[in-house]
Curated annotation (Swiss-Prot):
Belongs to the DNA mismatch repair MutL/HexB family. The keyword ATP-binding does not apply. This is DNA mismatch repair protein MutL. PROSITE patterns: DNA_MISMATCH_REPAIR_1 (PS00058).
């Protein structure tokens, strides 16, 4: 083993820079956060060639004196913390005193800064070594220009991604920080071209409208809730809208942009039964809580944080998301306007709701969707809508005063059945009946053991069975409304339940079983409906104001405004 030596300051700085300055966007982040901490109201970020050639950050903050500017170029020089206790009550974005020194050690830096009362200073640094110090006759604030990033660390430059990737990372960061501070005007200049400039008027909605396209802006729900010392606000995507297989979240804790799995899982819990498995909603979430309950000193990048009270944060966030989505469901239905001066009528002698919509076996209609001409007694469609008809044997088109709705009949009825089954289960209303010909199903020893373990739970769902040899069970009783199912349909449902039976969380298992039962008992895609059946379904949707997705998270209703149609056909 070689002799242990103390590394020279130059090498120590480069190692430290490797932790703080990973790529060009790290430079932008550190400099912009310093500008915010300095009280800036206007911040201009400019970069060239993905930040490798130039990164410039200009602000109108409080500025630095000559002494402070020189000191800032040394590691662990900061005005933001003074004692160990300060580490547990951090209110600024920067606090370690590493940023400028780390940047200067791996690039060529020019610092220009001036306070309100003292002369300005110009400092030129190369590779962490000060080359020049002069007076600067500028206005109050700070200008920092970073040239030739990693010029003296070729290995680091070699591992940078493409110019496009590095550019996108910088643009994304400035977008994120601009949303966190809508009261600050941010300007972004990329390769000499103005990318965007925010107004700094303090309105988050205006920043979101500027930074994202109209589709995103029009499909967001406002989020706001306060409970004790916890506050959450921001925007989340409407049910079934703006979902993606990739995480598309903007999380902020005390206005610090972070990555945090607790928040992510809480949001997904809030979207429970409204989000497709494996998908993520679009979210811009600001969480405010006491500073001492958040540890931001977990990693040099300050992106990772720890909550002192993880359970409380999780429950607060998930509840806020669910309440916002519930409110959106109510808003959606309350905004529906019935047709004026038109009474749309239907047959009076229709079947009950249960008869019409409970059993998919009853929907094998061979006739066309036409009402008999010779019936004289009618009833009005309760919601004041006009059913245009059914298309592709799955979608119902409904007209109101200023909207057209296209409804997925299976997904909509599946949600109705899901809500009904949940209620019936909680009240103990599910009843079972003996099937005429007991159904024998093949199961493995492990599956049989799990079924017997959860027998009490499954009996709550009105299923009953008995052993029928070492590898079979015989189903004797099923829920009442499954009585008219053919044996194959019942077997498919029970096999689906068996596949979920290994779930250890009983509440999740219950929910999975309810979903399976709802799916199997709902109207199927491909079932041709008569107008009576469509009317019952539409009335249930709009009267009960059910959530706008099926239990698995797929949207079941598409709203198209008259205005959208007229714009498409260039009528306005």
């Amino acid at each position: 083993m070689g002799k242990v030596i103390l590394l020279p300051e130059e090498i120590r700085n480069k190692i430290a820079a490797g932790e703080v300055i990973e790529r060009p966007v790290s430079v932008v982040k550190e400099l912009v956060e310093n500008s915010i901490d300095a009280g800036a109201k206007r911040i201009t970020v400019e970069f060239i060639n993905g930040g490798e050639t130039l990164i410039s950050v200009i602000d109108d903050g409080e500025g630095m004196t000559k002494e402070d500017a020189i000191l800032a170029l040394n590691r662990f020089a900061t005005s933001k913390i003074k004692t160990e206790e300060d580490l547990y009550n951090i209110k600024t974005l920067g606090f370690r005193g590493e940023a400028l020194a780390s940047i200067a050690s791996v690039s060529k830096v020019e610092v220009r800064s001036k306070t309100e009362t003292e002369d300005g200073v110009f400092i030129k640094v190369e590779g962490g070594v000060i080359q020049e110090i002069n007076l600067w006759q500028g206005s109050k604030g700070t200008v920092i220009k970073v040239f030739d990033l990693f010029y003296n660390v070729p290995a680091r430059r070699k591992f940078l991604k493409s110019k496009t990737t590095e550019t996108n990372l910088i643009v994304d960061f400035v977008k994120r920080i601009a949303m966190a501070y809508p009261e600050i005007s941010f300007q972004l200049i990329q390769d000499g071209k103005n990318k965007f400039i925010t107004s700094g008027n303090g309105k988050l909605e205006d920043v979101v409208s500027l930074l994202f396209d109209i589709e995103i802006h029009n499909n967001l729900i406002f989020l706001q809730r306060k409970e004790g010392n916890y506050i959450i606000e921001g925007f989340i995507s409407k049910p079934g809208k703006l979902i993606s297989l990739k995480s598309q979240d903007y999380f902020y804790v005390n206005r610090r942009w972070v990555r945090n799995n607790i928040i992510l899982q809480a949001i997904k819990e809030g979207y429970k039964n409204r989000l497709l498995e494996g998908y993520f909603p679009f979210s811009i979430v600001f969480l405010t809580l006491p500073y001492h309950e958040v540890d931001v000193n977990v990693h040099p990048t300050k992106r990772e944080i720890k909550f002192e009270k993880e359970k409380e944060v999780y429950e607060f966030v998930s509840k806020a998301i669910k309440e916002a989505l519930d409110s959106e469901d109510k808003r959606f239905f309350s905004g529906v306007k019935a047709l004026e001066g038109k009474e749309h009528k239907n047959h009076v002698g229709i079947k009950t709701e249960k008869e019409l919509l409970s059993l998919p076996m009853e929907f094998e209609h061979k006739s066309e969707n036409k009402l008999s001409e010779d019936i004289s007694e009618y009833i009005s469609l309760k919601s004041g809508f006009r059913i245009v008809g059914q298309i592709f044997d799955n979608y119902i088109i409904v007209e109101t005063k200023d909207r057209v709705y296209i409804i997925d009949q299976h997904a909509a009825h599946e949600r109705i059945r899901y809500e009904e089954l949940k209620k019936e289960l909680s009240l103990g209303y599910l009843q079972n009946v003996e099937i005429l010909f007991p159904l024998v199903i093949e199961v493995s020893e492990e599956e049989k053991e799990l079924l017997n373990k959860h027998k009490d739970l499954l009996e709550k769902f009105a299923f009953s069975w008995e052993d029928f040899g070492p590898y079979h069970i015989r189903i004797i009783r099923v829920p009442y409304e499954f009585l008219k199912f053919d044996s194959k349909s019942i077997e498919n449902l029970f096999q689906e339940i068996i596949s979920d039976i290994s779930e250890k969380d009983l509440s999740k298992l219950e929910d999975k079983i309810i979903k399976s039962m709802a799916c199997h008992s709902a109207i199927r895609s491909g079932n041709i409906l008569v107008r009576e059946e469509m009317e019952v379904l539409i009335n249930l949707i709009f009267e009960r104001k059910i959530p706008l997705t099926c239990p698995h998270g797929r949207p079941y209703i598409w709203e198209i405004s008259k205005e959208e149609l007229e714009r498409y056909f260039h009528r306005r």
